[in-house]
């Protein structure tokens, strides 16, 4: 949750006001290929709601909003949970004729620097199928630690709400259907800018210029891992590692005064992440959540956005005088998520297979980050 709001904040530059509107163009949920999900959730059951419980189509900062997951179906009993997360930001670096955009994928989680990648204090970098993730070996312990950190911090991100789902247990989760809601208090634009300066130091100046356009897309890759036995803690693993013990305890008998200074904590966390799980560990669920959004400080842009999509105005009390009301007609019926996902996957595979073999980079790009305008130009008979 913390990651999502910080990523949205990354695109903020210098605005004239201390208010900000984030227009949610689309939120999509995809299953990972080759994974049989033991935890299922439908796209329409993943929503952002306001304090009155209404689904929101734009976010007004500052303000309180809740991430609402309904009808999470756990198909079988689970033991201990671990998780992996990777976040890729699609930065528009060039826009050509007919709206064709060439996007630069930038990995934000793990945080990418010129020489390396790194995760936070609770996770280590792992790689699978050419993609990097931050692995949290004890997901429930981390969730509580992060929530405590945010709730007690200066920005008070996690607000207390009577509708929030209490964290009652972190292991031996029974097969059932669950709902989950967590309230987030989004601060003002100036406060978010301060967070950017302290958190987004891995982004170079050129990419920051591109981000200031106010429109973007980012993908969140999530893997949930379950095992019969708990993971090894970071402290326990480091205490038993000859190469990393001095990172954990600089006063250990064989650690001299320089051992701690030359200790590579990121390498040690990566080593721990690769070995922390019990041999019974398996992937229980794998999803990609994709966010397409744009930002503005103009309320008239918000009204236009609502009209274009036939969305109701979730916060009518914020409507400015003499502004026409937004139509509340229902949106046209669209195919189910499963049908759209199956059709999209078939079209993607057919399009990539029809491309000439010399287009290696484009084929790889379209396989990972499907861009209909760009990819379909090279397979018009398919699209």
Curated annotation (Swiss-Prot):
Tissue-wise expression: Expressed in sheath and socket glial cells in both the amphid and phasmid ciliated sensory neurons (at protein level).
Domain of life: Eukaryota
GO cellular component entries: extracellular region
Subcellular location: Secreted
Signal peptide (residue range): 1-16
Sugar attachment sites: 64
Keywords: Glycoprotein, Secreted, Signal
Quaternary context: Interacts with daf-6.
Described function: Required for the localization of daf-6 to the socket glial channel and the sheath lumen. In association with daf-6, plays a role in dendrite extension and ciliogenesis to ensure the formation of glial channels in amphid and phasmid ciliated sensory neurons.
Listed name of the protein: Protein dyf-4
Organism of origin: Caenorhabditis elegans
